[in-house]
Amino acid sequence: VADFSWDIRSPLDRALVAGRYGAQGDAGVALTEIRNFDLVQMMARRGKAREMTKAATARFGIAAPETPKAVGTADATLIWSGPDQFLVLSKGGKYTMDTLAPAFAGSASLSDQSHARALISVSGDKARATLAKLSSIDLHPDAFGIGAAAATSMDHTSITLWRGDDRNGQAVFNLLVFATFAESLWHTILDSAAECGVTISHSEELA
């Protein structure tokens, strides 16, 4: 019997070339892939939404979002992903299917999405202008402020989008995309941001 060895690779392993791209001068956009995260989809079972909400509050210390928002704790981000469902984004193995399942037994169905999605952070003073070319959502801070979230699409690709805390006074937008579409969306964002100048990198830190 042949032995197989499987290596976990980023879905952007080929597409991401760290460095500069596009216009010269000060870069208006920072495009970063976040790697090695834990992501669990939580979906309330039929008639159990209230029980799931109570379990989430007890487990995370905050209420899970019931509207399009992202809320954070010291070690996790809960992201609305649809009616009676949300995503748990974290690092370090504290919030995985195995560790969360006991608290939500009977109230929610859990699905590990850690290797099914790519996480892309778009930041900088031209981040909003870059994404505005690709999204039908109004990303102005008055309409899409810190903590706002949406299940939407960019370039005909379904994504989960939310705005993180500002970094150095600049907006930070986070995108979760299915791994099979990540490379295509990455190139689309690069093309959109090229006129602004882009710094490209990957990181182990959540944005």
Which ranges hold each PLM region?
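Basic, glycine/lysine-rich polyanion-binding surfaces/domains
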Residues: 1-207
